[in-house]
Amino acid sequence: MSLFDKRLSEIHSALRAKEISVTDLVQASIASIKEHDGEIKSVLHVDEEGALAHARQLDERLVKGNEELGLLYGLPAGLKDNLVTKDIRTTCASKFLANYDPVHDGTVSKKVKDADSVIVAKLNMDEFAMGGSNENSGFFPAKNPWNTDYVPGGSSGGSAAAMAARHFYYTLGSDTGGSIRQPAAFCGVVGLKPTYGRVSRFGLVAFASSLDQIGPVTKNVEDSAYVLQAIAGHDEYDSTSANVDVPNYLSALTGDVKGLRIGVPKELIGEGIDPEVRDAVLAALKQLESMGATWSEVSMPHTEYAVPAYYLLSSSEASSNLARFDGVRYGVRADNAANLIELYKESRSQGFGQEVKRRIMLGTYALSSGYYDAYYKKAQQVRTLIIQDFNSIFADYDVILHPTTPSTAFKVGENVDDPVKMYLEDICTVPVNLAGLPAISVPCGFSKNGLPIGLQIVGRAFDESTVLRVAHAYEQTAGFYGRKPEWVRG
């Protein structure tokens, strides 16, 4: 077994016993990127010098033995490139920010450092987190490690692909409409979206502020619990951060689901779901049933409106958030502008990619005078109805379970010229963001052509513990834990 296949708890034991060093781990991470990332292109920037220097400092602390070690001690990590990191380039995979080096850490970046993790690299993504395939990266698209003819998903495609390739012990992504869970499903890894407000967004470059949430991508559920433990909690720098207690997530991993009540929305298990995906999810339900859980079919009647409501709301918020990228304060600055208005126009035209421009235009239109009530206001009303759908189910059930995605990963270029088709791939994930709930994607099978299938488990607000408990119990008995592409080391 490769070092990078071991659980975080096993690695900590090896580090404390001085069987390996943090420097060994970081060097192995960097070597993996150099040797294998040329084809999957999950990594944008490697901070080799800074990561090795940090590793040596951590090794020295262990030798001295007079300091308590952090929860993520010594673990090499990769962060999605929209998480601000001091002195490590942060571009959001956009040419607009191609040379942007932040002068401070975001809260989550600081928390993983405070937990003694080593940030090795920043990871590929769809530009400004807008996309579901990583084909919208302003630099180059990432590929799926299971088959590079296929997309890794998005927008956190680099985070999921890098995890499947075992470049790191964990990665971090952001999830606005499924951007952690969908690529996790496509790449056969675990992706957790916490409750909105559970993890600080300070230092996350905003796409849609009422939807964005940071979360971990890992190779197993236990590791996700470790990482969430380190990054969760109230933050005075984020006004939307929830001031609620953070439980011990590791204590929730009991393996017990006896008496658990599972609701399965008929709208997300029937028509429009690939038969192979449906069969894998039904097999997962049968597995949980054999462990003492019960399940029933339920209804989320407003699901069909979730995708249009999501794209109206997220694009409206994006058009506001991205107004700050104007060529004046930072980023691309056009050279050929005759006046200030021309500077704004030319800088944004040169710096933003096609999908970002499309969503800015859609959002600006939805917010414009005469259309606000017809589009934005109506989308907010649909959001309320979707929240009510979830509340109705959770009155009788502990979790909701359904596919993470309607199909397995699609081929590179397959949907690139059809944005509506691309948007509809989000049907299983966007309702969770609209309601602000926690959800996890765990591997539950493979298609006939060898591509991973993801199972999504949704919980009540701030009940990540139950979500993790169910996911962990299933993972331990399902037989898919530890599977990785054949070429990956170990």
Swiss-Prot record:
Enzyme Commission number: 6.3.5.7
Transmembrane helix in keyword set: no
Active-site residues, Swiss-Prot/TrEMBL: 80 (charge relay system), 155 (charge relay system), 179 (acyl-ester intermediate)
Record key words, sorted: ATP-binding, Ligase, Nucleotide-binding, Protein biosynthesis
Cellular component per GO, a single term: glutamyl-tRNA(Gln) amidotransferase complex
BP terms from Gene Ontology: translation
Pfam families per record: Amidase (PF01425)
PROSITE patterns in UniProt: AMIDASES (PS00571)
GO molecular function, one term: ATP binding
Catalytic activity of the protein: L-glutamyl-tRNA(Gln) + L-glutamine + ATP + H2O = L-glutaminyl-tRNA(Gln) + L-glutamate + ADP + phosphate + H(+)
Stored SUPFAM superfamilies: Amidase signature (AS) enzymes
HAMAP family given in the database record: GatA
Described purpose of this protein according to its UniProt entry: Allows the formation of correctly charged Gln-tRNA(Gln) through the transamidation of misacylated Glu-tRNA(Gln) in organisms which lack glutaminyl-tRNA synthetase. The reaction takes place in the presence of glutamine and ATP through an activated gamma-phospho-Glu-tRNA(Gln).
Family membership: Belongs to the amidase family. GatA subfamily.
Subunit structure: Heterotrimer of A, B and C subunits.
NCBIfam families registered for this protein in UniProt: gatA (TIGR00132)
Name of the featured protein: Glutamyl-tRNA(Gln) amidotransferase subunit A
Lineage: Bacteria, Bacillati, Bacillota, Bacilli, Bacillales
